[in-house]
Amino acid sequence: MAGKVPTPHIGAQYGEVADRVIMAGDPLRAKFMAENFLENPVQYNNVRGMLGYTGTYKGKRVSVQGHGMGIPSIGIYTYELFNFYDVKRIIRCGSAGAFHPDLKLGDVVFGMGSCTDSNYGAQFNLPGTFAPIADFELLRAAANKAEELGIGYKVGNILASDVFYGDDAESWKQWQKMGVLAVEMEATALYMNAARAGKSALCICTISDSLVHGTACSAEERQTSFTNMMKIAFDII
């Protein structure tokens, strides 16, 4: 179902967005990807400062788009892309905080599944609990590409949390006990919107801080230095 464009959040006309989109929470990271990976990028969106560009990468038409922070924000952008712009696949390139002691700053994590403390799924009125998971073909391609490029990675469950500054500073350890690798704030909505629309999605994260070791990347590093996951995303999209 294509239509209802431009939307309140994306200023593009139908056809200006490619059917393959790589997303980032920070719109400046989207701009960085457009300037460093795309040939002949054309900006199609600056509504609310959430930058979007379309260009080509190795002969493929690809768009990059910011989505903001949190499940409600990515929920809006991915819904509109999947349902109004007829996007077929979305890969999120994001940052995450490590729960696993072996994960170091800059390591790459592929979110095979997305746990959450959000009630985003309640809207679907399901008679049970839905398990939001990545598209297997994208996940397999990402792992294979990481092997090919010699990039270290882990695959497993991640947590999409509604809370950045939690009142209980130790609650993450309960997720750690269940083998959850890392925390971010968006993958559940991405995966559920993809499932509902019959489309494909994958969340790739770079570790920007560690709750285990108390280390963190700078804001500048978060914006520009996560190139390994970007290489993977562009090669498999």
Language-model segments: what does each one mean?
Residues 1-140:
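Metabolite-binding pocket within alpha/beta catalytic cores that recognizes anionic/polar moieties
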Residues 27, 97, 159-164, 189, ...:
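Glycine-rich beta-alpha junction loops
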Residues 83, 167, 196, 204, ...:
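Expand to "…catalyze enediolate/carbanion chemistry for C-C bond making/breaking, isomerization
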Residues 129-178:
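Active-site rim beta-loop-alpha module in soluble metabolic enzymes
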Residues 141-149, 193, 232-236:
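Generic non-transmembrane alpha-helical segments
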Residues 169-208:
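A C-terminal functional module that forms or caps the active site or interfaces directly
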Residues 211-237:
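His/Asp/Glu-rich mid-to-C-terminal helical/loop segments that flank catalytic regions of hydrolases
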